[in-house]
Amino acid sequence: MTANTRYAMFFASLVIPCTAAIAGDANPYVGRWALTIPGGGAGWLGVTQEDGYLDGSILWGGGSVLPADWVFMADDSLCVFRFHKVERKNAAGKVVRTQTLPEVIMAKVDGDFLQLTQIEPNRNCVGFEQREFTGKRIPPLPAKPDLSKVKFGMPIALFDGMSLDAWKLTDENQKSGWSVEDGLLVNKPVQPQGGRHVSYGNLRTVAEFEDFNLKLEVKVNKGENSGVYLRGIYEVQVADTYGQPLDSHNMGGVYSRITPSVAAEKPAGQWQTMDITLVDRHVTVVLNGQKIIDNEPLLGCTGGALSSDESKPGPIYLQGDHTGICYRDIILTPVAK
């Protein structure tokens, strides 16, 4: 039997009516799952039981949390479909056909763990890729913390204005655009004119932290885009979004997860203050003196996370692979144990 024949039989089997073995019982797939996707990156899967159907959303490495196109049970396995539009062009570059290629992720639960298989046809429709990966159930969220009762330790200056000794790239194989200029932490990911694209790196603290308050100042020039990752897991967006409608991708939002309650960003080119508190998987963001996220729960990692495991300490990391950016006065105060 050829690989293509097995692939065709696999998809045929998914559309044959079947009775879920767990029908009538609590569905063990419902909940939130931290994924370690093929290649070791961070992902996330959320499965919900709606009135008469299953639904879900997924984060695959970078980008945003997106709705799954189709979620259903096949016997005791969970199937998650994502559909990808592929444009077919002729020799002149004109689009002559748009196809929809399916990608399926099949999951098998074992207690609090998932074994998953991703099957995706090649874009030339010859053969397919099959990848194995794993998931772990995310524990229920703790109760919303009473921040007035949280005790903090001594402040730590993460950036001393003189060196990058307390920092390193998240990927040492990438090029660094980061430097210290006049006491400021500056990123300049300059691309060569007409040359090959250079992959610039993100900057992280050498030290790792649990819960904390983080204060910093950032100057976002026109069109610039960065981000502040809490414990390397949750991105608080830094971007030139002044005057735009409220969106989770805007300045101060938790990227694709939590939309600010009010637009508090300043016009491009001005220094802005961020005051971020992370306690018990709840986050508060004060931007330029205005509270825009108030002790909201974090449902999982965001795109670009170093890890999907929310139980571990992690670094502060600053996104530097997009555009230039400038930071100063980065002070972290840990929660006292």
Protein language model annotation of sequence segments:
Residues G24-K337:
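Carbohydrate-interacting regions of secretory-pathway proteins
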Residues M1-R6:
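N-terminal secretory signal peptides that target proteins for export/translocation
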Residues A8-T19:
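Bacterial N-terminal signal peptides
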